[in-house]
Swiss-Prot record:
<keyword id="KW-0378">Hydrolase</keyword>
<keyword id="KW-0540">Nuclease</keyword>
<keyword id="KW-0539">Nucleus</keyword>
<dbReference type="InterPro" id="IPR000305">
    <property type="entry name" value="GIY-YIG_endonuc"/>
</dbReference>
<comment type="similarity">
    <text>Belongs to the SLX1 family.</text>
</comment>
<protein>
    <recommendedName>
        <fullName>Structure-specific endonuclease subunit slx1</fullName>
        <ecNumber>3.1.-.-</ecNumber>
    </recommendedName>
</protein>
<dbReference type="InterPro" id="IPR048749">
    <property type="entry name" value="SLX1_C"/>
</dbReference>
<feature type="region of interest" description="Disordered">
    <location>
        <begin position="190"/>
        <end position="219"/>
    </location>
</feature>
<dbReference type="GO" id="GO:0000724">
    <property type="term" value="P:double-strand break repair via homologous recombination"/>
</dbReference>
<dbReference type="GO" id="GO:0017108">
    <property type="term" value="F:5'-flap endonuclease activity"/>
</dbReference>
<dbReference type="GO" id="GO:0033557">
    <property type="term" value="C:Slx1-Slx4 complex"/>
</dbReference>
<keyword id="KW-0863">Zinc-finger</keyword>
<feature type="compositionally biased region" description="Basic and acidic residues">
    <location>
        <begin position="351"/>
        <end position="380"/>
    </location>
</feature>
<dbReference type="Pfam" id="PF01541">
    <property type="entry name" value="GIY-YIG"/>
</dbReference>
<dbReference type="InterPro" id="IPR050381">
    <property type="entry name" value="SLX1_endonuclease"/>
</dbReference>
<dbReference type="InterPro" id="IPR013083">
    <property type="entry name" value="Znf_RING/FYVE/PHD"/>
</dbReference>
<feature type="region of interest" description="Disordered">
    <location>
        <begin position="344"/>
        <end position="391"/>
    </location>
</feature>
């Protein structure tokens, strides 16, 4: 009897994967925590405007729901699900200190199964758990960013001691670890008509119901609608990387100075626009970790992966998360790369058509003006044939690594 096994193909670091917090607009005490790569679509599902959603958000009396806060920057769906579970279960998560877990379950009984009852969610409690989770070592070195879309929720966060700088964004700090805090109170985060169409399909949080949707097209680009849902923010970085390998400009490793052969190793590239520094992955890691040990005054060898540092060539800041997103996209994300290139190609084709139409119009005008008479004969001048130049399409080979 033969058995077949399905091999799971590794994926690039996603363009966006978030853990979000919903709050009921009619009843602010009702909160919901979930994860998604597409916040606008997921919010529509929770509000009954699209199929999907979750059983706990299906009550009409609690709709519409507002997405008041989210955390972005997770390197994979699994990473986001782990963080989501810990935020939903701070009384069980080993990422939370034991004394804090004891406080959370103090006075609560047990279920018939013997398990501790889950403490009731409150905004203060969720913010406290969120602060602890983004600060622990298991999550604190990820390129996470905390977004706030309601001012009162941000105020609760501030009272906890992680104050953002003025100007709508900033960095909260806990010891040597930092998290970027972004505020955007420009518009409501619940779509109009929420809860009117119906309950949709009731489904518990399914990690697969959010994948690969079209970008949200909303005229009001605030809040969750302003989040980048694809790899467009690193398109120039990806294009630079492709050109380096296509024209064999990688040269020697920026750290160890050894020659690099395409296709025979994992090579990372400086993300700064004017810099083409390329190096072995382990060389970049050692270089940036040494900088961290000096800057943060920690013992060498305590960490495995860096967070950020300075490029040895251009001396600009490099973020490890950005470098790994480009690397994994170059190695594992052929489909995503082609999607990026198609958008670029369509824009070029549209410009070419407009250019061609202009040339044809000029040709017709010249043809009309080119008719003259010589004696009693009409002489027609033959217009020069217009040949529209075609631009060579670029090809980007991109991949990713975790």
């Amino acid at each position: 009897m033969s058995t077949t096994t399905t091999q799971i193909q590794p994926k690039p670091i996603p363009a966006l994967y978030t853990v979000y917090i919903l709050r009921s607009q009619p009843r602010h005490a009702s909160l919901y925590i979930g994860s998604t790569p597409h916040p606008p679509r997921r919010l529509s599902q929770h509000n009954g405007l699209a199929k999907g959603g979750a059983y706990r958000t299906s009550k009409i009396s609690l709709r519409p729901w507002n997405m008041v806060c989210l955390v972005s920057g997770f390197p994979s769906m699994i990473a986001a699900l782990k963080f989501e579970w810990a935020l939903n279960n701070p009384h069980k998560s080993l990422h939370i200190p034991a004394e804090k877990r004891a406080e959370a379950v103090k006075g609560l009984g047990r279920r018939k199964t013997g398990h501790l009852k889950r403490p009731r969610k409150s905004l203060v409690g969720v913010m406290e758990a969120l602060r602890m989770l983004v600060g622990v070592r298991s999550f604190g070195r990820w390129p996470l960013r905390v977004h706030f879309f309601e001012e009162d929720v941000w105020r609760v966060w501030e009272r906890g001691g992680w104050k953002a700088k003025s100007g709508g964004g900033g960095v909260g700090e806990l010891g040597d670890l930092k998290v970027e805090v972004v505020t955007d109170f420009g518009s409501p985060t619940a779509p109009q008509g929420a809860g009117v169409i119906g309950m949709g399909e009731e489904a518990e949080n399914d990690p697969h119901d959010d994948d690969d949707g079209d970008d949200a097209q909303d005229e009001n680009k605030h809040g969750i609608y302003a989040l980048p849902l694809d790899y467009a923010p690193i398109k120039d970085y990806v294009a630079k990387s492709q050109e380096i390998w296509e024209f064999e400009r990688q040269g020697s490793c920026v750290v160890c100075k050894e020659a690099m052969v395409a296709g025979r190793g994992l090579y990372a590239i400086c993300p700064n626009t004017s810099c083409e520094a390329v190096g072995h992955l382990d060389c970049w890691s050692r270089c940036l970790l040494k900088q961290e040990t000096r800057r943060m005054k920690i013992d060498e060898g305590d960490e495995i992966l860096p967070v950020k540092g300075e490029c040895p060539k251009c001396h600009g800041e490099v973020l490890w998360g950005d470098m790994m997103k480009e690397l994994t996209l170059r190695i594992r994300g052929q489909a995503e790369v082609e999607k990026l290139l198609k958008k670029k190609k369509r824009r070029r084709a549209a410009k070419g058509k407009e250019k061609g139409k202009g040339k044809v119009a000029d040709e017709k005008g010249n043809n009309a003006e080119g008719r003259n008479t010589k004696g009693n004969r009409e002489v027609k001048t033959t217009p020069q044939r217009v040949v529209e130049d075609s631009e060579d399409s670029e090809f980007l080979d991109i991949a990713c690594l975790q």
